[in-house]
Amino acid sequence: MTAFLPFLAFLFGLIIAGLPLLWYIRQQKTALDGLQARVLEGAKAEEQARRIPALEQAVESWREKASLLMAEQAANKRGEEEREKAYRQQIEQLKATEDALSQKFDSLAAKTLEKAHGQFLEQAQMRFAKSEREGEAKLELLLQPVKDSLKRYEASVKEAEQLRQTEYGSLTALVSTMREGQEAVKNEANKLVNALRTAPKARGCWGEQQLRNVLESCGLSEYVDFETEVSVNSEKGRLRPDAIIRIPNGSILVVDSKVSLNAYQDAYDAVDEDKRQLYLQAHSKAIKAHIDGLSQKNYWDQFKEAPDYVIMFIPGEHFLSAALEQDHNLWEYAFQKRVLLATPTNLIAIARTVAAVWRQEDIAHNARKIGELGKELYERIAKVDAHMRALGNSLENSVKNYNKFVGSFESRVLVTARKFRELNIETKEQEIKEAPILEITPRMEDKE
């Protein structure tokens, strides 16, 4: 409005200055009308003066005056036309100035709005970009432990898979080894028997070695899963079982190897069936004697972690089967003496059960570890979610402040600016458009 005050003052002064000019023009027009009336009267008088020579000179004088008046009137008329033309030019200049000022104001208002809108969008984009960069940095920092946890979890899974494949390969190799070993045993049995018959100490060492081989073939490690020749003192003297197998719950299994070979070999070499039966009976009695001797050692009293029985390892299926043929109650007799008879087949089953329990213990440990990692991962994801929600609230507040600015600009600035159109100011159909309102809730695309 301040820019229009000089224009209004100029217009008002022009109107004040034009009032005398209009009055003067009106007076000249009145005089001209009177002059025309007098000319008409003079013409009438001239008609009458034709008859009167004396009046001719007066008529001529009036004519001269009329000519002068008409010339003056023509001059006044030309001056009036020039003044009117100048006045119209001034009016046109005023209108052009008014149009230029209106266009300049509209352009200035549009540029101001566009500049303010652009500056706000630029600042908003800068803030959004900064918030996005900070959010990405924070998110990357927060997700780094998650990545590390996932890498550790992936490494654990790969290790478990490799362990499974290794165990499967070990089992396959073990079966192949057992098959080859059985063939080798058949070929070397006679040589071994002859060597063992002549050296009792060698028989004991052979039985202990067979026991160690069976345990190790099942995946148990010496000094970790089992120990050999562990000595304890008792009332009956120094006791030394051949092996102690450790179980994950803290218990132990006591295993002692017993080899009864002489009577069995005599029966195998006997040609007469009666003698063969006698030797087999002697072999069965020797097995029973080993059971009695092992029962009397009371290993369950010396090892508090051991159950109330001891395992008697016989390093050969045929040794036990030959004794059972002569005494069918041998299993029950040994059980009553708290002795469990075990051949390589039975002991393999026991050892594999123990190894499986150890593996289950490892799996349970890994499962607990995975559970802890999962809990840690969940807590960190919850923190990430909280930060994401805080970032969303910040963006929502920025959009709300922008909408408040647009609403204030629309209701307090543009409303006043649009009133110029009500004053019939030429704006050449230029209209100030409304600033857009941003949506607070982002539109999400539907995903099938």
From Swiss-Prot:
Q: Identify the stretch annotated as signal peptide in this record.
A: none
GO BP annotation list: DNA recombination
Coiled-coil annotated spans? 43-167
Alphabetized, the UniProt keywords read: Coiled coil, DNA recombination
Which InterPro entries is this protein grouped with?
DNA_recombination_RmuC (IPR003798)
| Stated role | Involved in DNA recombination.
Family, according to the entry, reads as follows: Belongs to the RmuC family.
Question: What is the protein name given in its UniProt record?
Answer: DNA recombination protein RmuC homolog
Q: What is the organism field in this record?
A: Zymomonas mobilis subsp. mobilis (strain ATCC 31821 / ZM4 / CP4)
**From which lineage does this chain's organism come?**
Bacteria, Pseudomonadati, Pseudomonadota, Alphaproteobacteria, Sphingomonadales
